[in-house]
Amino acid sequence: MRVKCTIAYDGHLFNGYQVQPGKRTVQSELEKALAVIHKTDGRVPVYSSGRTDSDVHAAGQVIHFDTPLSIPGEKWPFALNALLPDDIAVKTAEIADDGFHARFSAVQKEYRYFVYTEKHPDVFKRHYAYHFAYPLNVQKMREASRHLVGTHDFTSFCAADTAVQDKVRTIYELDWTETVDGLQMRITGNGFLYNMVRIIAGTLLDTGAGKFSPDDVKAMLEAKDREAAGRTAPGHGLYLWSVCYDN
């Protein structure tokens, strides 16, 4: 039986999502809890919609695992949350079709990047939003964002050492919303390359600060060269917000 779960986690104290020997990760904590439920010393593999890096958070990560246990779908959050640490929570669970895969069945993801622009750092926000105290021209950021919407080769906006050959992705929406204490970037697409969202966020913030123009961002995209684009924004402002699947 295949179980699909939507989970949330605070990425601050994790070394990313994926299992790493000797390090605390989201996947390792999930598999540890499942091993207890299954009363096994072996591994119960967990598959996610995608990896997240150290400090990156998730409000709507999706995972799946296979189990021989006849636990109803709606009971799995109770079983897992009783064993998981406080910085991971299973929000929902359901029995999925055998052909469902958390990663390969996904058709759209949404990320959000949070920035607070107060004059001085806030110790209570330092792990959950990026402090950017420079004046920002939000209109320029929105104008630059429009160049990135659509289907493009995003070589300039992914980590230079990525092993992925096909760097064409489609961004459906990319917008900036002003909040009480700063800004929120919302981006949806059919998939994202390694560090793609953080590089886009860093580049657009620097555009708002006057380092780049909207036309510069268009030229960065066309250059297909990581060195042409801006910096990578810190991980702690980034949230995997939701993952969508065909019914």
Swiss-Prot record:
Keywords: Isomerase, tRNA processing. It comes from the Bacteria. The active site is at D53. GO terms for biological process: tRNA pseudouridine synthesis. The keyword tRNA processing applies. It catalyses: uridine(38/39/40) in tRNA = pseudouridine(38/39/40) in tRNA. SUPFAM superfamilies: Pseudouridine synthase. Substrate binds at Y111. Gene3D superfamilies: Pseudouridine synthase I, catalytic domain, C-terminal subdomain, Pseudouridine synthase I, catalytic domain, N-terminal subdomain. It is an enzyme of class 5 (isomerase). Formation of pseudouridine at positions 38, 39 and 40 in the anticodon stem and loop of transfer RNAs. Belongs to the tRNA pseudouridine synthase TruA family. Homodimer. This is tRNA pseudouridine synthase A. It comes from Bacillus velezensis (strain DSM 23117 / BGSC 10A6 / LMG 26770 / FZB42) (Bacillus amyloliquefaciens subsp. plantarum).
